[in-house]
Amino acid sequence: MATFKDACYHYRKISKLNSSILKLGANDEWRPAPITKFKGWCLDCCQYTNLTYCRGCALYHVCQWCSQYNRCFLDEEPHLLRMRTFKNTISKEDIENLLNMYDTLFPIHEKIVNKFINNVKQRKCRNEYLLEWYNHLLLPFTLQALTIQLENNTYYIFGYYDCMEQENQTPFNFVNLVSNYDKLLLDDKNFNRMAYLPPILQQEYALRYFSKSRFLDKPNRGLKRNDFSDNLMEDRHSPTSLMQVIRNCVAKHLDDSEWNKACTQVTNAKNYMEVMNSAYTEHYSVSQRCKLYTKNKLNTLSRLTKPNYILSNHETCALNVHNCKWCQITSCYKIWEDFRIKKIYNNVLDFIRALSKSNGMAGHCSSQERIYRYIPKLFLIYDEEQWTESVNSLFKCLEPVEISEVEYVLFDHEINWEVRGLILQCMNGSIPRILNLSDVRLILSSLIYDWFDIRYMRDTPMITSTTNELRKLNKKNELIDEYDLELSDIE
């Protein structure tokens, strides 16, 4: 059994404040919940189990039982998970406030210990101090935390997490923040708690404390596209669909600059109960536009590219080619439902085909040419070094002619109207008959940046913003984009 979950269950009964704060879905009756996908630690109850997605941030960090309360570590409402969540720089004072909150919610003194022992020893068979019966008294105060970096913020979710040696399939990683505090002072606090326990429980308490307070930080694997669930999409079949986010809020909005002081609210039980009584939910429709999602789409596009088209004689655009095994794309992939991807694919291949034909490259659909190997990488514009190298190699394959120490290639083949319009925009209103390497780079980048200008995108989706940030962006009408109207980034 998870120690933190057990402690919340038993300590709920000692006061009205605890009854309100320590209510976990994992300790309540199970309700229908979404299917699980990853193995990891539930941030709400701290147990290692199968995780499902959070309705507040789309990350997999909540178990099937706790999902019924829809709590997210990015919420505004000061529930237990939010009060255990700290952001960016953590001072010694912040940690002291956290430990004071723990001491308020999970006290150990003679009266509490005797009460729990008397509750357990109700039958003759329970005269021994079995660890299973006193698991809730074996919760040490540690500075063990799961951390994650979202955009420009680093979040630390403190708690007591069992089974640290288990496989972690989530983007959260363990860190030990004891160096931000006084190690000897933390030892002293735990030794004082241990003093009230029977000797056999003291031994187990000490073992748990030292194992969770002396470990080395675990490596951070970073965020991946699959770490975010698609279940928050309004329409899972639409690549431009908005994401529906639910956040728990309170009437008195707290400023993000005071983020790390949320745990101090438990010191005044009356005020805390008043704040919690004003709790409500806010719903936001948020764009999925960000570098993480865009990179995933461009990677898929690169993998599905059919470079043979650039030397073909098909009289239609690349995506409309049928009955040609060398040029016809596999249309079953969801990515082709995104009109932006279609436009980028058609326009880039149309431009490269015009360059190839202009410079006398002979070939056909089934021919094997060296230039083909560089075409898929032209879509990976987020990797500047690889993309530049691919453009340079492609330019060399066109056998440029040197004029006044500058190499040029011909450009006199027909192109479609969209490519023509984009070239007019980036080449000062004219379409040159010869292009140098710099011109080719500019045109190729413009064809992609027209729809995915990755230079100005967030790293992670906006659903990872704090509730205050979402509220501010919503007032400015900046949570959604204009892609549904087929307006590009440039427009």
Curated annotation (Swiss-Prot):
UniProt motif (pLxIS motif) ranges: 485-488
A GO term for molecular function: metal ion binding
UniProtKB keywords: Host cytoplasm, Host cytoskeleton, Host-virus interaction, Inhibition of host innate immune response by virus, Inhibition of host IRF3 by virus, Inhibition of host IRF7 by virus, Inhibition of host RLR pathway by virus, Interferon antiviral system evasion, Metal-binding, RNA-binding, Viral immunoevasion
A GO cellular component annotation in the UniProt record: host cell cytoplasm
Location in the cell: Host cytoplasm, Host cytoskeleton
Region of interest: Zinc-binding domain: 42-79
Main location: host cell
UniProt region (Important for cytoskeleton localization), positions on chain: 82-176
Residues covered by region (Interaction with host IRF3): 320-491
Residue ranges that the Swiss-Prot or TrEMBL entry lists as coiled coil: none
GO biological process: symbiont-mediated suppression of host cytoplasmic pattern recognition receptor signaling pathway via inhibition of IRF3 activity; symbiont-mediated suppression of host cytoplasmic pattern recognition receptor signaling pathway via inhibition of IRF7 activity
Transmembrane segments: none
Region (RNA-binding): 1-81
Top-rank lineage group of the source organism: Viruses
HAMAP family, per the entry: ROTA_NSP1
Domains (record comment): The integrity of the zinc-binding domain in NSP1 is important for degradation of host IRF3.
Subunit structure comment from the entry: Interacts (via C-terminus) with host IRF3; this interaction leads to IRF3 degradation. Interacts with host IRF7; this interaction leads to IRF7 degradation. Interacts with host CUL1 and CUL3.
Function: Plays a role in the inhibition of host innate immunity by inducing the degradation of key host factors required to activate interferon production such as IRF3, IRF5 or IRF7. Associates with components of cullin RING ligases (CRLs) including CUL1 or CUL3, which are essential multisubunit ubiquitination complexes, to modulate their activities.
Family: Belongs to the rotavirus NSP1 family.
Protein name as it appears in the record: Non-structural protein 1
